[in-house]
Amino acid sequence: MGLSDGEWQLVLNVWGKVEADLAGHGQEVLIRLFKGHPETLEKFDKFKHLKSEDEMKGSEDLKKHGNTVLTALGGILKKKGKHEAELKPLAQSHATKHKIPIKYLEFISEAIIQVLQSKHPGDFGADAQGAMKRALELFRNDIAAKYKELGFQG
């Protein structure tokens, strides 16, 4: 089920704060992901060697990838659920090339919520958190459907 116009507005309001520093937010999201779920680091050849949080914070490649991830996610969120065109190539690459399980998308969704809670507590109250969780769940469900079409059991 989709989000209401009001819920999308809550999502996009806080996303405006994220866009002020995509690379910084993205880096923090990836660090939380890798610290909370170290197994996810194995999917990233560029980052496998980063063992400590300090090493991760010092990595320009990690910062760049964080920017890439959140730029793509922002483009999807702005479509308010009508994200078929944006989702298809993302699902294709994540299923066939990177082989990223849906579970890992759940993990990064959790990390996104945590980063938004810590960086924007005034703009990310219970209603906004609920809306963002639903938006990310919609994204994951749609990616999972694409994975299935592609024959990937992620």
Curated annotation (Swiss-Prot):
Where on the chain is Phosphothreonine found, per UniProt? 68
Q: Which GO terms describe its cellular component?
A: extracellular exosome; sarcoplasm
Q: Might you give the EC number(s) for this enzyme?
A: 1.7.-.-, 1.11.1.-
Q: Which PROSITE patterns does the record match to this protein?
A: GLOBIN
Gene3D superfamilies cross-referenced by the UniProt entry? 6.10.140.2100, 6.10.140.2110
State the reactions this protein catalyses: Fe(III)-heme b-[protein] + nitric oxide + H2O = Fe(II)-heme b-[protein] + nitrite + 2 H(+); H2O2 + AH2 = A + 2 H2O
Ordered alphabetically, the record's keywords are: Cytoplasm, Heme, Iron, Metal-binding, Muscle protein, Oxidoreductase, Oxygen transport, Phosphoprotein, Transport
Which biological processes are named by the entry's GO terms?
A: removal of superoxide radicals
Q: Name the positions where heme b binds.
A: 94
Subcellular localization, per the record? Cytoplasm, Sarcoplasm
Signal peptide bounds? none
> What is the protein's quaternary organization?
Monomeric.
**Which protein, by its recorded name, is this?**
Myoglobin
Q: Which organism is it from?
A: Lutra lutra
